[in-house]
């Protein structure tokens, strides 16, 4: 297995982000605060929060903000206590989508291993409420692995999202270090089962570079995703949230990111590979509407 050391490396210039437009960030943040909604943009310290909030978009984080898993790369708070789901959350989320006039919305969640269905029913309710208030809005769900509960997966898919995203996060060799409660093969199976159960959905997955992976392992990962019917892939640079988290092993150059993009699209036939240092799984997710027109189902 590839070793992951604790030594940090210097951040390069290409990871610098332009200063955000404070006023427009404030408008989006205030709306989310008024409706008592969480976003992964805030909870996971996403580097693109300025750009996304300034454009009036956000990735909603439901059933949180605490997560029942403590992955060493993630900045979301760990909370293993049993918590009741908020029955008003789906309606509040739908209201935010309506007021922000979103053409495309991304809904994700923390892991809720304390729930029998992993939160599948809450995903279903959120999609249903958004459809009622914003019927023209396309919906992308970024879901956890549900501990391999395939009936829960089917419950989520019964809500008929346009896109089902589940991130594989890293190469197989690093899984036990990076996602100790996850499973590489289970993630691939979830993605494959998604297309088998709901053939018209667009499937998506993403992963990070800079954790100690080798280039040939990245190519294998891309091939594994394609073999399991994934349509869209996102690849971004891992940035350590703090000293207690896994540290960056390398900063991958923009040209290397582009190499993986070209390999995925030209050699493997993905619909789209979004690959750059600042790419995150929901970054520019609204562009899925263009893909849906280009590759109709």
Swiss-Prot record:
GO molecular function: 4 iron, 4 sulfur cluster binding; lipoate synthase activity; metal ion binding
Domain Radical SAM core: from-to ranges: 53-271
Pathway membership: Protein modification; protein lipoylation via endogenous pathway; protein N(6)-(lipoyl)lysine from octanoyl-[acyl-carrier-protein]: step 2/2
Reactions accelerated catalytically: [[Fe-S] cluster scaffold protein carrying a second [4Fe-4S](2+) cluster] + N(6)-octanoyl-L-lysyl-[protein] + 2 oxidized [2Fe-2S]-[ferredoxin] + 2 S-adenosyl-L-methionine + 4 H(+) = [[Fe-S] cluster scaffold protein] + N(6)-[(R)-dihydrolipoyl]-L-lysyl-[protein] + 4 Fe(3+) + 2 hydrogen sulfide + 2 5'-deoxyadenosine + 2 L-methionine + 2 reduced [2Fe-2S]-[ferredoxin]
Key words, A-Z: 4Fe-4S, Cytoplasm, Iron, Iron-sulfur, Metal-binding, S-adenosyl-L-methionine, Transferase
Binding site for [4Fe-4S] cluster 2: 67, 71, 74
Name listed for the protein in its UniProt record: Lipoyl synthase 1
